[in-house]
Amino acid sequence: MANTKSAIKRIRRIATQTLVNKARKSKYRNAIKKMNLLLVEKKKDEALKFLPKLNSELMKVAKTGIIKKANASRNISRITKKISAL
């Protein structure tokens, strides 16, 4: 258990930040799942419309450190390649 006042405050802050990070991670994973579903159903027009939103979501989580920037770039690259192959 934390002994100092500042350590107790940090525990509260970490708990809050953990919830925020989980929500952001969940949001980006759901966006990836939605895009993969569009690709499986071969809905190229909808996938192209959704691509900027997905890019934005991936870069947001990469910027905040939830995932690494290389991971986000790799995901965007692979999805873009799949869309162009449709």
UniProtKB/Swiss-Prot annotation:
One of its GO terms (molecular function) is structural constituent of ribosome. InterPro entries: Ribosomal_bS20 (IPR002583), Ribosomal_bS20_sf (IPR036510). GO terms for biological process: translation. The keyword Ribosomal protein applies. Keywords: Ribonucleoprotein, Ribosomal protein, RNA-binding, rRNA-binding. The keyword Amino-acid biosynthesis does not apply. GO terms for cellular component: small ribosomal subunit. Binds directly to 16S ribosomal RNA. Belongs to the bacterial ribosomal protein bS20 family. HAMAP family: Ribosomal_bS20. This is Small ribosomal subunit protein bS20.
